[in-house]
UniProtKB/Swiss-Prot annotation:
Gene Ontology CC entries for this record: cytoplasm
EC code: 6.1.1.22
UniProt cross-references to InterPro entries, sorted A to Z: Aa-tRNA-synt_II (IPR004364), aa-tRNA-synth_II (IPR006195), aa-tRNA-synth_II/BPL/LPL (IPR045864), Asn-tRNA-ligase (IPR004522), Asp/Asn-tRNA-synth_IIb (IPR002312), NA-bd_OB-fold (IPR012340), NA-bd_OB_tRNA (IPR004365)
Species per Swiss-Prot/TrEMBL record: Herpetosiphon aurantiacus (strain ATCC 23779 / DSM 785 / 114-95)
Name of the protein: Asparagine--tRNA ligase
Gene assigned in the entry: asnS
Localization of this protein: Cytoplasm
Organism superkingdom: Bacteria
Catalytic activity: tRNA(Asn) + L-asparagine + ATP = L-asparaginyl-tRNA(Asn) + AMP + diphosphate + H(+)
Family indicated by similarity: Belongs to the class-II aminoacyl-tRNA synthetase family.
Record carries keyword Protein biosynthesis: yes
Enzyme class: ligase
Length: 447
C-alpha cells in the first residue's frame, strides 16, 4: 500500500471536484450535532474537512468524533469550492483512517506561558505562528544562498571546531581535543573563508556559530546561524553595495513566497515593501552626533520610552542607541568606520585615521538592531601581525592566517549576517528565540 497521500494540501486548488486522499495531523476539531469539522494540516497548508453524518458510515463518523488534537490520519473525500475558506475550498469527507490517536496533547488551545512553551519547543513548532516563522526562516536561508550563487560565490565550508579565537577570547566555548589541548566552538567562519577567497575569488560559508556571552536580551543566542561571504579585490563600498542587494533580494523573496505566513504573524508588510537599494549610510562620527542631539532634545527609545542615554566618542552602541538611530530612517541603516578599539583585530584601518577601521554594521528598522557586521580586511601581513599582538593573541596560533597575506594578498572584504536576527525582523517577532527551531540561551539547553 502506498503511504504517500494523493497530493499535498497546497497543491489541491487545481483538483476541486476530484476525490483525493490527504494525510496529516488534526490541528483543531469541533463538533456540531451531525457535523464534525476537522482542521487538517500537512505541513504545506491547513484545510477544513467536513464530515456529514448522513454521507459516511457509522464507523467513519465514530472515527471523526474519536480524533483528538495532533492525531495523525488519512482523510479521503472530495474537494469542494468554498469562498469562506482561506484556501478557497474544503474537503467533503468520505473516509478516515487513523494512524495514531494522540492522548493528552500538552499544548492545548488555552493560553500558555513562555516557560511552558519553551520546555515543549519540540511540540510548539507545530503551532501556526511558529510554523510560519520557521517557513520564513527556510526562505531566508534559501534566498541568501540563491543570491550569492547567482553572483558567482562558491560555498566554502568552515570548521566548527577551531584551535584559535576569531573575535576575542572572552566568549569562547572550550572543549578538550584529545592530546592537543583545547578546541573551541567557532565564533565565526570568516578567517577560514578568507583562504577560500584566494582560491575561488568569491566564497561564503553557512553554518552554526557560538558565543559564550552571558546575555539574556531578546537579541542574543549562544548558538546561532551565520552566512558569511568574502570576496577579493573589494573595498568597503563594494561590501556595502553587495549587502544592500543581498538583503533586498531576501526581503523580496519573503514577500513573494511567504504571504500567508506573514498574514498569520500579522506582519505589516508595507514596512518591508520599500526595502530596496540604496540604504542610508552614516559614519560612526555622525551617529554619535545624532545621539547627542537626541539626548539634548529629550529623545526616548521604543518600546519602553526610556530616555536615550548619552555616549562619548569611542563607546560602542547599545541596543537602545541602534534602535534610536534606525528610527531616523525607513530603511536598514549602515553605520560605518567605528573606533578601532571596539572592533576585531583583522579590520583595515581607515586611510589617514588609524583610530577607526573600515567596517560597517547594518541596522534593521523597527528596533531589530544589527543584522550584518562587515569590514574590509587587513591585507598587509606586518600590520595584521601587529594587530594580533595588540589584542593579546598568540601570533603562533595565527601563522596560517598570516600566510594568506604572505602569498598573493589582495584587498578584500566580507560580512556576516545572522539568520535569526534577519528572520525576527522580517517576521516581526520581538524575540530571537522564536526564529530558530531549538534556541540555545544562557539558561536554556533543553530540549
Amino acid at each position: 500500500m502506498a503511504l504517500l497521500p494523493s497530493m499535498y494540501i497546497r497543491d489541491s486548488a487545481d483538483h476541486v471536484g476530484e476525490a483525493v486522499k490527504l494525510a496529516g495531523w488534526v490541528y483543531h476539531k469541533t463538533e456540531k450535532g451531525k457535523l464534525v469539522f476537522i482542521q487538517l494540516r500537512d505541513g504545506t497548508a491547513t484545510i477544513q474537512c467536513v464530515v456529514f453524518k448522513k454521507n459516511v458510515s457509522e464507523e467513519v463518523f465514530a472515527r471523526a468524533k474519536e480524533l483528538t488534537q495532533e492525531s495523525s490520519c488519512y482523510i479521503h473525500g472530495t474537494l469542494r469550492a468554498d469562498e469562506r475558506s482561506s484556501l478557497g475550498f474544503e474537503l467533503d469527507v468520505t473516509d478516515i483512517e487513523i494512524v495514531h490517536l494522540t492522548q493528552n496533547y500538552p499544548i492545548t488551545p488555552k493560553e500558555h506561558g513562555t516557560q511552558f512553551l519553551m520546555e515543549h519547543r519540540h511540540l510548539w513548532v507545530r503551532s501556526a505562528k511558529q510554523h510560519a516563522l520557521l517557513r520564513i526562516r527556510a526562505q531566508v536561508i534559501a534566498a541568501a544562498q540563491e543570491y550569492l550563487n547567482s553572483e558567482h560565490f562558491v560555498r566554502y565550508d568552515s570548521p566548527i571546531l577551531t584551535a584559535t579565537a576569531a573575535e576575542g577570547t572572552s566568549d569562547l566555548f572550550a572543549t578538550e581535543y584529545f592530546d592537543l589541548g583545547n578546541a573551541y566552538l567557532a565564533q565565526t567562519g570568516q578567517l577560514y573563508v578568507e583562504s577560500g577567497m584566494a582560491t575561488f575569488g568569491r566564497v561564503y560559508c553557512f553554518g552554526p556559530t557560538f558565543r559564550a556571552e552571558k546575555s539574556k536580551t531578546r537579541r542574543h543566542l549562544t548558538e546561532f546561524w551565520m552566512i558569511e561571504p568574502e570576496f577579493a579585490f573589494a573595498d568597503q563600498d563594494d561590501n556595502m553595495e553587495l549587502q544592500e542587494n543581498f538583503v533586498s533580494y531576501i526581503v523580496q523573496r519573503v514577500l513573494d513566497r511567504c504571504e500567508e505566513d506573514l498574514k498569520i504573524l500579522e506582519r505589516d508588510t508595507s514596512k518591508l515593501e520599500n526595502i530596496v537599494p540604496p540604504f542610508p549610510r552614516i559614519s560612526y562620527d555622525e551617529a554619535i552626533e545624532k545621539i547627542k542631539q537626541g539626548v539634548a532634545a529629550g529623545a526616548t527609545v521604543a518600546p519602553d520610552n526610556a530616555p536615550l542615554a548619552d555616549l562619548e566618542w569611542g563607546d560602542d552602541f547599545g541596543a537602545p542607541h541602534e534602535t534610536y538611530l534606525a528610527s531616523l530612517f525607513d530603511k536598514p541603516l549602515f553605520i560605518y568606520n567605528y573606533p578601532t578599539k571596539v572592533k576585531a583585530f583583522y579590520m583595515q584601518p581607515a586611510e589617514g585615521r588609524p583610530e577607526v577601521v573600515r567596517c560597517a554594521d547594518l541596522i534593521a528598522p523597527e528596533g531589530y538592531g544589527e543584522i550584518i557586521g562587515g569590514s574590509q580586511r587587513i591585507h598587509d601581513a606586518e600590520l595584521l601581525e601587529a594587530r594580533i599582538r595588540e589584542h593579546g593573541l598568540d601570533v603562533a596560533d595565527y601563522q596560517w592566517y598570516l600566510d594568506l597575506r604572505r602569498y598573493g594578498s589582495v584587498p578584500h572584504s566580507g560580512f556576516g549576517m545572522g539568520i535569526e536576527r534577519c528572520v525576527a525582523w522580517l517576521a516581526g517577532t520581538r524575540h530571537i528565540r522564536e526564529a530558530i527551531p531549538f534556541p540555545r540561551q544562557l539558561y536554556r539547553i533543553y530540549p
